[in-house]
Amino acid sequence: EHATGLALDITSESNQTLDETQAQTQEQQWLMKNCQNYGFILRYPKDKTDITQYIYEPWHYRYVGEEAAKAIMKKGITLEEYLAQIQK
């Protein structure tokens, strides 16, 4: 997904380890609340592994555009679920 140029990993300056501890940093807390305002989503949310087929990655964000990002985050769904809904 990184090869598309639409995904990136964002870590805290104080914690650059790519693991679940990222979710507790102030930076990630802010990003999780505000990323959709800039067109990004948390790509692999907690408890959605069965849908995304990826483990929870609180550092991995994907650009989808502001409208889609706000819809995805408001509904608490994944990109896969969103795409399935709009294709109906």
Features from the language model and the residues they span:
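Cell-envelope/glycan interface and biosynthesis
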Residues: 1-88
